[in-house]
Amino acid sequence: MVWRVPPFLLPILFLASHVGAAVDLTLLANLRLTDPQRFFLTCVSGEAGAGRGSDAWGPPLLLEKDDRIVRTPPGPPLRLARNGSHQVTLRGFSKPSDLVGVFSCVGGAGARRTRVIYVHNSPGAHLLPDKVTHTVNKGDTAVLSARVHKEKQTDVIWKSNGSYFYTLDWHEAQDGRFLLQLPNVQPPSSGIYSATYLEASPLGSAFFRLIVRGCGAGRWGPGCTKECPGCLHGGVCHDHDGECVCPPGFTGTRCEQACREGRFGQSCQEQCPGISGCRGLTFCLPDPYGCSCGSGWRGSQCQEACAPGHFGADCRLQCQCQNGGTCDRFSGCVCPSGWHGVHCEKSDRIPQILNMASELEFNLETMPRINCAAAGNPFPVRGSIELRKPDGTVLLSTKAIVEPEKTTAEFEVPRLVLADSGFWECRVSTSGGQDSRRFKVNVKVPPVPLAAPRLLTKQSRQLVVSPLVSFSGDGPISTVRLHYRPQDSTMDWSTIVVDPSENVTLMNLRPKTGYSVRVQLSRPGEGGEGAWGPPTLMTTDCPEPLLQPWLEGWHVEGTDRLRVSWSLPLVPGPLVGDGFLLRLWDGTRGQERRENVSSPQARTALLTGLTPGTHYQLDVQLYHCTLLGPASPPAHVLLPPSGPPAPRHLHAQALSDSEIQLTWKHPEALPGPISKYVVEVQVAGGAGDPLWIDVDRPEETSTIIRGLNASTRYLFRMRASIQGLGDWSNTVEESTLGNGLQAEGPVQESRAAEEGLDQQLILAVVGSVSATCLTILAALLTLVCIRRSCLHRRRTFTYQSGSGEETILQFSSGTLTLTRRPKLQPEPLSYPVLEWEDITFEDLIGEGNFGQVIRAMIKKDGLKMNAAIKMLKEYASENDHRDFAGELEVLCKLGHHPNIINLLGACKNRGYLYIAIEYAPYGNLLDFLRKSRVLETDPAFAREHGTASTLSSRQLLRFASDAANGMQYLSEKQFIHRDLAARNVLVGENLASKIADFGLSRGEEVYVKKTMGRLPVRWMAIESLNYSVYTTKSDVWSFGVLLWEIVSLGGTPYCGMTCAELYEKLPQGYRMEQPRNCDDEVYELMRQCWRDRPYERPPFAQIALQLGRMLEARKAYVNMSLFENFTYAGIDATAEEA
């Protein structure tokens, strides 16, 4: 039974497969290989530059399986392999069900982007199509026939593009076939159709592809008003451009020429693989052709040779040879001598156009010569050959060359315009008949630069220029011609011709001179040179200073002042230089100070404001403009330490014959806490050394000096100490009592009394001196114990581990030993050891309150490499040491991954720990994103190129994908980051993003924060804000915010909202709005990360997989174009602190 579908039920879904003119693109399925694991699909492009990416003026070939309509059980991912520049192969099928479905290959660029579609049916299906591809004209009736292969006594369901279409009773089968008749089909009826037994597996369906041309039979064009050229050998007229899409094995404007056996492609340039030729291969071409066997083969597996008298694709053509011609199943009739034509029906007496190219290309406004050769009997002469333009204009030949076997007419074409693009025709007419050949003429516009060339680097006598810029007109660019000459000069331009892929170095220029530079681009062919582009001014640099100074000497003029002097070698001529640059490097702090001496005649300088007690490395360089000359050999200078100001209002008061009390006031403007006071005691007028006494209680403002001699005048002064001794106070005098000196008045005493007093005085002095010695000895022992305790504390750090146990970390050569107090057994963690001598500190990268990061060159395993060295400052607290040691533990346990900042090694020196990690040359991701906001940094560039960022959509998506891979690794290691944000993601080599800052990471599944501290509120999940609970799902929430930061080019999350508002609105369902430049799919991923219930948020493995698929899709998921009213997301630096 045949079911006729009413017009109002025609399907509206179809697969778009072609835009623009036909592209030389072929998709081959090797049906000889029945084993799924050996089966493969190959897509071949005959286009120039196909498959080589944007560098070849077009995107790469894409071959994939389309699961939107025919869905099969998921399996391992298929493998895509590229063979050369124009071929891609899809492999990796594991079971027969993997083969069933729709496959597509996409090639071409711009308006010529083309999709070729192949539908694969299971050989063991219940129903099989009599013919898979059906190409019909608009308004025709299409009949789809499904042959019963394995009978089931159930109804048959027809579907269109995966949706229900119609049901047939199983009794309605005719001759073992179920038919679907579609009358008056229209282009929207195109698509994938299937016939399936009710309740049977979809894999047992018969799949069809219906292609409906946009015009009626023999017509093409927007209004279907143009007549098709009459395609031969089964070719199909394209309804958009009127070209013939030739079946595999034929070529030519009208598919009139047969390829050699085993050849295919628009120019017969491709060869079927293997010794079997095209046997067992299905060829799929751009619509409206569809798919078929190769020429000379037929059958569902394309392995049956044509029956006698048949030839061509699917053996659909009949030879019907006349005049003794024989039928060849690949090319058709092979005519005997004296006859030609499709059926050998034409005598050789009829004239024939010879060897006419099917396509010619010329440049705009050129006057080319076109040759047309013909043969026949009678012989063609000059007047019998003419040339017709697309507008019907007839051109007569200006010259004819007569040879024994042919006549070649030469036509001089008037100056070409764009309207001359199209199909031209060469026609020959003699008394024996006439012949014509159509060929396509493409008129190309020479390229013209839209912008001036870019200056890459400059020196005093050369400029390095990037000449290839955006241009209008047609490519490809064959040569670049660059003109340059001094500014405001009337001399001739100097010219350099280079390859378009190379930068240009302009040599032997004058220093500090402006040069006008412009570019001319050329494409292949006569007249391919475009107009000159806009000029730009490029200025050479000043001449480099070549003299190397040397340091003559230096002397310290104070604790923070240094006088430096230097000299230069004597050379003839004027001095090339504008001044001197003095550099002081503080290796302890990792800081460099630069002092500019602006006079080239200066040979001395006073450096002030230096840090007392600091060891500096000093050198001097001559500079000219912005160029530095060679540095002098370095010198090493140690400044003396400085102490606090002198104590104030020192006063002395005698208490007895052996004691004097000193009182004072603390110094003002102290740079830090006083560690002690030092008192100097000296007998007035005495010649011996003074005695220094330490006052170890710095909070006191008085002390008693004991053990003095009676009736003796003493001099006193004192100073404070803060990491160094300070200035002395004023000197005061005071005498001890005795020998008639009393506190309240003179007392008269006898001689005997005086002798007794002398004996008492001697005993008092001896006792006082003995007590003083014992006190000093006890103090020394105390200092030794304190020093040992400090050294031990410097080498041992205690921190709270993830398990809640207090952990002691002790560092030895190459191991980090963790002793958990509840346990008796230590747990050593090994780390790579770096020797202190193998670390060369360079520039300061960053600095915090208690730590700093310095770029350094390290030597590891015999190789030198850049590294970032993390260290704590001297006054860091025990908590800082705990977190720092905890970060080393995390790095040791994490191991290596390309998307995290990895540990290179650790080193201990003088009891301090130094951690070496990978160096990220591009800094943190947040700053990198904000620097890309080119509309703010270079508005002219942004508007000229129509872009809001120097980063592409693909690169932004790559940042997110790398971060997701890194977080997947952390989550698999059961680590919680707790502070995931763009500021804590670093950009390394090749712009790969790496998760960093593991100071807050925890190696456990759930962590509950119990201490106070600043919180990254804008990145925190709801459960973390409300209950201080952190899990991997909390990191997933933060990743959603990170993804928003990437899309917004470093915007501040929830900009304009306070933290209090976030606490209130987030539990109520409020989320950040979708950025205007963000695709729906990316924003949906953000929303999934911000779900209220943590268990509903996707795992990092799923996030990484989704972002990876987005990267493979090559779709602009983040729009960086300058659309109307474009604005960047807001930035609030104060809000980011919370």
Swiss-Prot record:
PROSITE patterns: EGF_1, EGF_2, EGF_3, FN3, PROTEIN_KINASE_ATP, PROTEIN_KINASE_DOM, PROTEIN_KINASE_TYR
Tissue/organ expression: Specifically expressed in developing vascular endothelial cells.
EC code: 2.7.10.1
Main location: membrane
Purpose of the protein: Transmembrane tyrosine-protein kinase that may modulate TEK/TIE2 activity and contribute to the regulation of angiogenesis.
Ranges in coiled-coil conformation: none
Catalytic activity from the UniProt record: L-tyrosyl-[protein] + ATP = O-phospho-L-tyrosyl-[protein] + ADP + H(+)
Family: Belongs to the protein kinase superfamily. Tyr protein kinase family. Tie subfamily.
Active-site residues, as the UniProt record annotates them: 979 (proton acceptor)
Post-translational modification note: Phosphorylated on tyrosine residues in response to ANGPT1, most likely by TEK/TIE2.
Keywords of the record: Angiogenesis, ATP-binding, Cell membrane, Disulfide bond, EGF-like domain, Glycoprotein, Immunoglobulin domain, Kinase, Membrane, Nucleotide-binding, Phosphoprotein, Receptor, Repeat, Signal, Transferase, Transmembrane, Transmembrane helix, Tyrosine-protein kinase
Residue pairs linked by disulfide bridges in the UniProt entry: 228-237, 231-244, 246-255, 315-327, 321-333, 335-344
Binding locations of ATP: 845-853, 870
Membrane topology: Single-pass type I membrane protein
Ig-like C2-type domain residues: 43-105, 372-426
Outcome (variant: residue 1109 to H): In LMPHM11; uncertain significance
Transmembrane segment boundaries: 760-784
GO CC terms of this entry: plasma membrane; receptor complex
This protein's name: Tyrosine-protein kinase receptor Tie-1
Intervals, Cytoplasmic compartment: 785-1138
Pfam families given in the database record: fn3, ig, PK_Tyr_Ser-Thr
One of the GO BP terms on file: negative regulation of cell migration
Domain EGF-like: 214-256, 258-303, 305-345
Signal peptide span: 1-21
Domain Protein kinase: from-to ranges: 839-1118
GO MF annotations in UniProt: ATP binding; transmembrane receptor protein tyrosine kinase activity
